[in-house]
């Protein structure tokens, strides 16, 4: 019999119904919060390219259907009903003993949504620092992450267009098709394995994370810090407490 159940992202493979079975068996649950899905059906707190907290402000998830936040009416309804089920049954509030957020920003949002403050704590992400690394400098601006709209990679491409003398390199898998015209100083590296990613960071000048969404606690910030590379990010979400103002 386990002493504790550690839960991370339940969706899309595990139903919140599993939490009731753990509670029935008398095993306490600690849930690590990686996004905002307990409050916002999409998990992003984002609508029309901007941060959105309407579901938090109204105390329910139906705005996801109203604004079609998943850009598919059927998908938006499905995501909303999933959250409605969890809220009506108390799947999280009744069964989870403690919530471990990765930033204080997340913690404050859960508390604002009605979760008891004494059950919500902060355990930031960590990383194993490399024993040694090569810091022979590079001259390019580095982007690390999915090439998708919420990550704001297109914003950085526009910055590259305005600064043709500076090289920009993007490491990450494409998640969407784009007809953007790519300037000559932009290079796509594709998905990089860990050793390749370490070299990519080491040889950059700095890392930029232009996310439109709040994000959780991006590991890329820690990876860059391990190699003495600063990260530039937006002044919203947990970025200000991770990077500093």
Go through each PLM region and give its residues.
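Short alpha-helical segment that forms part of, or immediately flanks, the ligand-binding pocket
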Residues: 198, 221-226, 240-241
């Amino acid at each position: 019999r386990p002493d504790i159940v550690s839960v991370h992202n339940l969706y899309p493979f595990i139903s919140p119904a599993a939490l009731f079975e753990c509670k029935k068996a008398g095993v306490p649950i600690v849930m690590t919060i990686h996004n905002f899905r307990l409050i916002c059906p999409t998990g992003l707190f984002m609508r029309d390219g901007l941060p959105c907290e309407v579901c938090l402000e109204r105390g329910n998830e139906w705005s996801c259907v109203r604004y079609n936040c998943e850009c598919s009416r059927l998908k938006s309804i499905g995501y909303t009903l999933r959250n409605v089920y969890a809220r009506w049954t108390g799947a999280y509030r009744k069964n989870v003993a403690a919530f471990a957020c990765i930033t204080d920003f997340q913690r404050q949002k859960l508390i604002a949504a009605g979760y008891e403050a004494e059950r919500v704590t902060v355990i930031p992400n960590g990383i194993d620092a490399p024993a040694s690394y090569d810091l022979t400098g590079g001259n390019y601006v580095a982007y690390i992450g999915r090439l998708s709209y919420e990550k704001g990679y297109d914003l950085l491409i526009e910055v590259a267009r305005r600064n043709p003398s500076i090289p920009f390199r993007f490491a990450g898998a494409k998640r969407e098709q784009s007809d953007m015209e790519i300037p000559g100083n932009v290079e796509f590296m594709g998905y990089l394995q860990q050793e390749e990613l370490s070299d990519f960071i080491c040889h950059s000048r700095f890392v930029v994370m232009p996310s439109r969404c709040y994000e959780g606690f991006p590991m890329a910030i820690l990876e860059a810090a391990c190699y003495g590379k600063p990260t530039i990010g937006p002044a919203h979400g947990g970025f200000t407490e991770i990077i500093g103002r």
